[in-house]
A protein has these predicted regions:
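Extended hydrophobic secondary-structure segments that form protein cores and membrane-embedded regions
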Residues: 205-208, 381-387, 411-416, 838-840, ...
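Alpha-helical interaction elements in eukaryotic regulators
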Residues: 1, 5, 25, 49, ...
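Long, structured protein-protein interaction/assembly regions in large complexes
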Residues: 3, 10, 16-399, 536
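Surface-exposed, charged/polar loop-rich segments
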Residues: 200-208, 212-220, 224, 402, ...
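Short secondary-structure boundary/capping segments
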Residues: 174-176, 189, 220-225, 397-404, ...
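Short helix-terminating capping/connector loops at secondary-structure junctions
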Residues: 197-201, 374-380, 405-408, 831-833, ...
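Flexible loop/turn segments at secondary-structure boundaries
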Residues: 214-215, 390-394, 420-423, 846-847, ...
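Noncatalytic, typically N-terminal accessory segments of nucleic acid-processing enzymes
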Residues: 7, 56-58, 63-73, 82-96, ...
Length: 943
């Protein structure tokens, strides 16, 4: 009893007197009464404030019509509630804040959403709040839309609904149904499928691609591979377009139906298309292609060179200032003027169930896009961006079907994002096994797995940054190479300029030529990206022209063929479609999602982002097995994604016009990576100081054979010749079909070098085939000349006797058989004689002493070879070392060839020892260099 009383009255204290307990007040009775009075007064104030706010809340009549207006959050809550919440969060103040914080708006909306006019006090009450539509605020609706779009998880939405954070799942389905049916009704009335957010009178482009959903549920039996079409409008300060009505449904007409109406049949039904069999030949090309093709060599000033000079200057600083921009994107953004464009208007059309990789779907997509574009901008030629496989289908439709699909009616573009990805993959193929990925790993720029992924351009943004770091590093390494050259020049010698030194070094050193070519190719790829970011159409066309020969040389036939067609189309654009060309020159061939500098992206890039927003991270579990749910997602998905974008656009803070890389932390990290990569290259050997005639993998010091060196020296010439021949034969003369196979070069590279050795069985088969052909010719000749067949095999008919040799190599004997023939004349002696000097066979010692834990050749000598030699000096006065000499015409040459061959590797003190030690010793040049290295080290030993 005492404990319960004390818990109820905390101001009381207990005093024990014998068996009795006395309860008394801690303080004076007056203070207690005053405190009780004050609490009653505060309770009255709170009650008055609550009544005022509740009165205003209950008068709120919200209605959601399918759009989030810019001031929808502020208009959905009463001013009294907003003021009270602001005072609670920030404290009472006389300062008026015109911009309410999002925190204040969020709490206020949740209060309104969870408010009830009266409390239901029933025994069967579950405690959940009953929400009415009149007090539905934008935030709970947005929360449900966001969760559904991201996870598509009903239970998660219901959990947050019970917490009072979002609307229920049933209400979400009701909204999606009303929106979808209202949108479809509008499409029926207008006779065309064209989203209401698009404006009239604006230049409009489109993108088409697959949209794939692979169900992750173990009970799923199917997947979705449909087609998505997005429309993009390009407003600017001069042309903003005319708004169309955006209310997508009437909130006063509530409906409980969850049934989705059907789309217009003219849109949803894809008619079949069949192409007549025939030769696929490119239409006649105007003279503008030739002039553009020839004039494109006169490139404009390259900002990439200025960036490299700027990076070299900034790397000499110990610490960067906040105004120093060393990364490529930040530097280019600092040199770009503020854009005059407005953020693009992007809308996704209802999706199709049909796969995009079909002639019928591509032809239907072209019709759908043309109808929508002409509805809002009647005089415009439709512009459609697609990936490479769809581009090939679209061009076939244009060239074979013609009429309403021909090149006068449509402009088909190859997606810029896919061109960039293909370019970096091609660059990765050229860099494979060169040591580039290992250099990035050793520098700490990336882990080995991530560095290897750069070769395949698995993550485009990371890959692009890695090449930027590499380009800045290679440029500085080349400058250091030139400084070393200047230090070696005598006073009486003429000093070469940097350009003269570079050209001379490229002619002499394959190593210099390879890495200088890598730098040029990286800058070419960055120039393509800069054309997108700056919306520079002429630079875009020139960058494509510079990259195309590499696709031919490195055997990328699909992009070599169809990117050439795209290049042809862009060159013909000024004469064939001058209005489209004028818009492209204004920057409308890319998408400006924000007002940030140097941030425009390609059409197919923004289409991929829109697709990702519709699909979310939850996949399409259960959709493909439910036709109604699938149709709801196909039609309502774009509209729900549009509403989420509207809400998030309203809550975004004041837009920053600076590029996202123009931050001091990003620049410091970039400079650190460049310095680390330079150190990594210098540890392995600066490729621009190598004056040798060999091409070496910098990480392993493996020496490439002559075929790889020839590839490095001729790759540019081969690509240019094949590209020029392709343009002449397919576009100008039209003597060949566009689908005729391209010549495959199979150029040996770092990853493919090495000669193939025929097995014994295959070698025997080759010899038998040669003998059979030879005998046939000799037999026929003998008969025609009345020869004596009895003497047919009297003479040798091969350059070497088959009984003594095979494929030009002497047949070897068995040493064990020779040992048996030697007489046993000497006696066995188990004790070593006492001598003053010994002669050691260095080659035998190397074969006998494996590297064990030694990592480099320096460590091998210090930890393995030298201790063995010093051990011999303990019992003798003098030790002599002799080494093998490998003569090209030695009798043992064939025996060594039978043992196989390993990888050629340069021997330097810091060179890592190969894992295959036996294979390394099978190469005569490796042993020559290793023996010389060990002999020179032995000469410097002190006893």
């Amino acid at each position: 009893m005492k404990d319960r009383v004390l818990a109820a009255f905390p101001d009381l204290t207990a005093h024990t007197q014998g068996r009795e307990v006395l309860l008394a007040l801690k303080h004076e009775i007056g203070d207690v009464l005053k405190e009780a009075k004050d609490k009653d007064s505060e309770a009255q104030h709170l009650a008055k404030a609550a009544n005022i706010v509740r009165r205003d809340i209950l008068q709120i009549k919200n209605s959601f019509n399918g759009t989030f207006e810019p001031e929808c959050q502020r208009n959905a809550i009463p001013a009294s509630l907003k003021t009270l919440i602001s005072m609670i969060i920030k404290g009472p103040t006389t300062k008026i804040d015109p911009a309410d914080s999002q925190t204040c708006l969020t709490v206020s909306q949740l209060v309104v959403f969870n408010s009830v006019s009266r409390v239901r006090d029933r025994p069967d009450s579950t405690g959940s709040t009953h929400h009415i539509r009149a007090r539905e605020c934008p935030l709970p609706i947005y929360a449900a839309l966001k969760i559904h779009g991201t996870t598509r998880d009903k239970s998660l939405i219901e959990t947050f609904y019970k917490l009072g954070i979002c609307i229920s799942y049933d209400r979400l389905l009701s909204i999606s149904t009303e929106i979808t049916n209202s949108v479809i009704g509008r499409y029926e009335r207008e006779g065309v499928v064209c989203p209401s957010k698009l404006r009239e009178g604006l230049f409009t482009t489109a993108a088409v691609d697959n949209i794939d959903h692979n169900p992750s549920s173990i009970s799923a039996h199917d997947s979705f591979h449909g087609t998505a079409i997005s429309l993009v409008q390009h407003p600017n300060t001069e042309e903003r377009g005319n708004d169309r009505a955006t209310d997508v449904f009437d909130p006063t007409k509530s409906s409980t139906s969850k049934k989705i109406a059907q789309l217009p049949s003219s849109y949803s039904e894809v008619p079949p298309v069949a192409l007549p069999s025939g030769q696929l030949r490119v239409p006649e090309t105007t003279g503008q292609l030739i002039s553009q093709h020839q004039a494109s060599s006169n490139s404009e000033s390259d900002r990439e060179i200025d960036w490299l000079d700027n990076a070299k200057e900034l790397l000499s600083k110990e610490e960067l200032n906040k105004s120093d921009f060393i990364s490529w994107a930040a530097y280019c953004a600092s040199k770009s003027s503020l854009p005059s464009h407005e953020p693009a208007i992007i809308s996704l059309l209802p999706m199709f169930f049909e796969n995009a990789h079909s002639l019928a779907m591509i032809a239907h997509s072209m019709k759908v896009i043309k109808s929508a574009v002409q509805h809002i901008n009647p005089s415009q030629i439709p512009v459609i961006a697609v990936d490479q496989p769809l581009f090939a289908l679209a061009k076939q439709i244009q060239w074979i079907l013609g009429e309403i699909y021909n090149e006068d009616q449509y402009v088909i573009m190859l997606g810029g994002l896919h061109i960039e990805m293909a370019a970096f993959k091609m660059l990765g193929k050229w860099l494979t096994c060169s040591g580039w990925a290992e250099s990035l790993c050793n520098a700490g720029v990336a882990t080995q797995g991530v560095a290897d992924s750069f070769l395949a351009a698995s993550h485009l943004t990371r890959t692009r940054r890695a090449h930027q770091v590499t380009a800045a590093s290679l440029n500085l390494l080349m400058s250091k190479g030139y400084e070393e050259y200047l230090a070696k020049v005598d006073d009486n010698q003429q000093v070469k300029s940097f350009q003269e030194w570079k050209e001379d070094s490229q002619r002499k050193s394959p190593q210099f030529l390879y890495w200088a070519g890598v730098l040029d190719l990286q800058l070419c790829c960055l120039k393509l990206v800069r054309a997108f970011r700056e919306a520079n159409f002429s630079m875009y066309v020139n960058a494509i022209k510079q990259i195309l020969p590499w696709f031919f040389a490195l055997d990328h036939p699909n992009y070599a063929r169809w990117l050439s067609v795209h290049y042809r189309d862009m060159c013909e654009l000024p004469g064939k479609h001058p209005h489209v060309h004028a818009q492209f020159c204004k920057g409308s061939f890319v998408v400006h999602k924000t007002k940030r500098c140097f941030s425009s992206i390609a059409l197919d890039h923004v289409h991929e982002q829109v697709n990702a927003g519709v699909k979310g991270e939850g996949g399409a579990v259960g959709l493909t097995e439910n036709p109604a749910a699938l149709r709801r997602w196909m039609v309502a998905g774009p509209e729900l994604a549009r509403m989420v974008e509207e809400f998030e656009g309203n809550i975004s803070s004041a837009e920053d016009h600076h590029h996202h890389e123009q931050k001091h932390g990003f620049q410091s990290a970039f400079a650190k990576d460049v310095k680390s990569l330079i150190s990594s290259y210098e540890e392995m050997g600066n490729p621009f100081t190598d004056e040798g005639l060999e091409l070496i993998a910098i990480h392993t010091k493996d020496v490439m054979d002559a075929a790889v060196v020839s590839s490095v020296q001729t790759v540019s010439k081969i690509g240019e010749e094949q590209f020029n021949t392709f343009v002449k034969e397919r576009f100008v003369d039209r003597s060949k079909l566009i689908t005729d196979p391209l010549k495959k070069n199979n150029l040996p590279t770092f990853s493919t070098q090495g000669k193939k050795i025929l097995s014994k069985d295959k070698a025997k088969v080759e010899i038998l085939k040669e003998d059979c052909a030879l005998f046939s010719r000799l037999y026929i000749a003998c008969q025609s000349r009345d020869g004596n067949l009895e003497e047919f095999f009297k003479y040798e008919n091969q350059p070497w006797p088959p009984s003594l040799s095979q494929m030009g190599s002497l047949r070897g004997g068995q040493k064990a058989d020779l040992v048996k023939c030697l007489p046993n004349l000497s006696t066995t002696n188990t004790e070593s004689p006492k001598v003053d000097a010994v002669i050691l066979d260095g080659a035998v010692i190397v074969q006998m002493l494996p590297p064990k834990t030694a990592l480099t050749f320096e460590e091998y000598f210090d930890a393995v070879f030298a201790p063995y030699v010093m051990k011999q000096l303990e019992s003798v006065i003098r030790v002599d070392l002799v080494w093998d000499v490998y003569v090209s015409d030695s009798l043992k040459r064939s025996a060594r060839e039978k043992r196989g061959s390993g990888q050629r590797r340069k021997v330097f003190p810091s060179t890592r020892i190969p894992s295959d030690w036996k294979g390394f010793l099978r190469v005569d040049q490796n042993k020559d260099e290793l023996f010389k290295f060990l002999a020179n080290k032995v000469r410097t030993m002190t006893t």
